[in-house]
Amino acid sequence: MEVSLCILLFLLHFNEGIHGVRFTQKPFHQTVTQGNMVRLGCAFEGLSEPEIIWMKDGEKLFSTDQMYITLDPYHWETFHSVKSVQQQDAGKYWCEVEYHGAIISSEPAWITVAGVPHFGVEPEDVAAFAGESFNLTCAASGPPEPVEVLWWLGGEQNGDFTPSPSVLFVKGVNESIKFHCEPRNARGISVSRTGTVHIKARPDSLGRTGHHVSDFNITLTWSPGFTGHSQLSTCTIQLSRGPGEVKLPDVVVEVPPFQHVFEGLRSYSNYSVRVRCDNEVGSSPFSPWVDFHTPQAAPSAAPKNFTFDLSEQQLTLSWATLEQEELRGRLQEELRGRLLAYKLQWNQGGESQDPLLFKENVAHLSGAGRFFNATFQVAACTMAGCGPWSQPVLVMPVSAMQAQTQRGHMWVGLLFGLLVATMVGLLLIVLIRNRGKETQFGSAFAAQGAEVPVSFTAARSFNRQFPELPESTLDSLGINSDLKAKLQDVLIFERLLTLGRMLGKGEFGSVREAFLKSENNSGQKVAVKVLKTDINSSSDIEQCLKEAAYMKDFHHPNVIQLIGVSLHRRAQQRLPIPMVILPFMKHGDLHTFLLMSRLGDEPFTVSQQILIQFMLDIARGMEYLSNKNIIHRDLAARNCMLNENMSVCVADFGLSKKIYSGDYYRQGSVSKLPVKWIALESLADNVYTTQSDVWAFGVTMWEIMTRGQTPYPGVENSEIYEYLIKGERLKQPPDCPADIYEIMHSCWSPVPKCRPSFQHLIDQLELLWAKLNPAPVKEPLLYVNLEEEDGEQANSGTRSSEEPSWGVPWQCAGIEEDEKDWLMVSSGAALAIGGDYRYIIGPSVSAIDEESRHSEDGLSEDIREEEEDVIINV
């Protein structure tokens, strides 16, 4: 009861409030001539500060031409003005006030705009056949009314005024003609837009035709030309396999859109395409033939007739080449691209070995004995990838194969031998029994206490513990005598080395921290480079020791020097593991240092003067190597080390070669190369010179200026050659001065003889270094020890048919035409390029340290871990 009473009192109070507020003035109807001013007014009383809103045709009006005037504290007046009335201002207007959630509205008023007629329908262009009749429409309205319309056709008045809306009937014309209409009322005359009557015709030739090739599909696009004033309905596409070859059936597509996708085309094939379009009159001429080439694909079949020939010196493998041939009237594709190489993989003892690539359909492998009981398979490779593997072939000695074929004839001999053995056994038993009787008879007369006339010592011990392994010497390796003589005076016994944690792993092995004791019990901290454990020939060891032999002759502050060579003897293994002993570099490799300056836990700034000093150190070291006829072939920031004085030393000579004659070295064996640092001619012909080291020096300068970024970001290794041959090069880093970029850019000339020498680079960098102000004396941030107390370190990885354009930066006097041509693949050379190839002698994760602490033979365990094989993605 009390609740109902409260609601009743509230409603009474609300009604009293509603009755207490009201509009005292309302807007009134007005008819205004177009262009004049109009003003509407409202007055409201009952509220102290009411919010009065103007409405037009149900929408709020937001305008600066509104005014509010206070007549008294509870009486307000507002005005809405339009300075220049146009037709769009005509409509219904009123005022609104919100009070206690209710909307109070004034009575509406209409504004009518009077003027010359305004168009509701203007004449539009017309397309018609010649002589075909058609209608033209024109509609206009006031106020004021009435409105009459006059037609003009071809510049002449057609008939008299007719009421709006007006429809003009035209019997037909034979050529294009202009027209317009003129509506009039009491205020004046309006003139419509000028329309055109077009005569329909056949469409013209198409505009631009384009295509996009993706895998085995092509998306064809074209733009229509003049349509003949008639909408295009269909287009006809003709496709043929190259000019003059068989034409495929026509394809008719509805348009728009003006595109079509051809699917399932032949890979690595030439095609030609042309298009025409149709309207209701006829067809356009065909567009010119557009040629395109589908990309390569991985082969669809494996090589057949895979056989081997085993001799005492070598193993020869051969197989049939893949072809494209007609089979039952249908083209059967096997190769599906340009053959790049044949990939040979082999397995021995259940372990996969490094695959090999060969240009021809035959492989000659030396050292036939090491391939006994090995299984081989071969696959063909194009630029798109490798096809399926062939059936495996098991390599067995000829005697074993003959034994297998003759095994059935051995049963007779086996049975005969068994019979003979039984008879001999029975005879021996009889003889032994007789001999035993004679022995027993003789022992009865033996003197007691007599000495035994014969005694012996066991020639073999059955102790289960392995005996201590002897120290290995160079004589046990089977290397050539010159290399052995060169390393004899730097051979260090393994017992003088105490191996510690792993510093990093690379393609050819690992690097460990170690402590080297001398004969007088003093010692020093060193770094030991250890070859992988899967070596199985003296040639593998010889390759590693050649690097040490190179470094033995190096005596330069910017080239790492050799301390010695040691050999790790393995139980039950014929060959030891070579270990190269090098100075321990406190600050690690240059790439990791630069990377930590940007991305470390505590980033630090490296001045431009110090960056140039890094470049100078590397250039001086490389100048020293070039004077000694050494080609490094793997110059990069990751292979440059920082000693305790922050001087850079060129290191890692695993790919180095000494030039004995001429000025170039041709790569002729399987090796894994850092593609993004390799010069253009080296990628094409496997030729390496000092000028190719200059190219790599330019890339290293780019690494230094970008603080350790990876070169060619976004470009895959398999795309590098095509990227460079088009004239593209590394872009100028954001903070790199133009003069420094000009120096590094000069290192990337496509013509090797146009690149600067290392001595010239030193002169240029010294001039730049001299221009800079001396760096501050105190730069503690530069002396950052990347090693932490617990052995952990930060990770170092961040991981056309047109002719190439030879740009101005690489123009050089005397360039021969043949110097601009390179072969994509060198004939007769095994190809093995690819991968990101980042083997860094740098920080390791704590898990490796933990493993080396708890392993009884840390070397044998850790160096078994290998990085994934990196072969060119062909």
UniProtKB/Swiss-Prot annotation:
Under Gene Ontology molecular function, one entry of this record is: ATP binding
Query: What residues bear Phosphotyrosine in this entry?
Result: Y665
Q: Where this protein primarily resides, as one coarse class?
A: membrane
What are the disulphide bonds in this sequence?
Answer: C42-C95, C138-C181
Q: Which residues bind ATP?
A: L503, G504, K505, G506, E507, F508, G509, S510, V511, K529
Name the enzyme's class. transferase
**EC number(s) on record?**
2.7.10.1
Q: Which species is this UniProt entry from?
A: Danio rerio
User: Can you state which reaction this protein catalyses?
Assistant: L-tyrosyl-[protein] + ATP = O-phospho-L-tyrosyl-[protein] + ADP + H(+)
Q: Where is the Ig-like C2-type domain?
A: 21-106, 117-198
UniProt domain Protein kinase: residue ranges:
497-768
The family annotation for this protein states:
Belongs to the protein kinase superfamily. Tyr protein kinase family. AXL/UFO subfamily.
The record gives the membrane topology as: Single-pass type I membrane protein
Sorted alphabetically, the keyword list is: ATP-binding, Cell adhesion, Cell membrane, Disulfide bond, Glycoprotein, Immunoglobulin domain, Kinase, Membrane, Nucleotide-binding, Phosphoprotein, Receptor, Repeat, Signal, Transferase, Transmembrane, Transmembrane helix, Tyrosine-protein kinase
Official protein name in the record: Tyrosine-protein kinase receptor TYRO3
Q: Which Gene3D superfamilies match?
A: Immunoglobulins, Phosphorylase Kinase, domain 1, Transferase(Phosphotransferase) domain 1
Q: Name one GO biological process term.
A: cell surface receptor protein tyrosine kinase signaling pathway
- SUPFAM superfamilies per UniProt: Fibronectin type III, Immunoglobulin, Protein kinase-like (PK-like)
User: What does the record give as the function of this protein?
Assistant: May be involved in cell adhesion processes, particularly in the central nervous system.
**Which residues are in the Fibronectin type-III domain?**
202-297, 299-403
Compartments where located: Cell membrane
Classify the source by domain of life.
Answer: Eukaryota
Pfam families (UniProt xref): I-set, PK_Tyr_Ser-Thr
Q: Which residues are glycosylated?
A: N135, N174, N217, N270, N305, N373
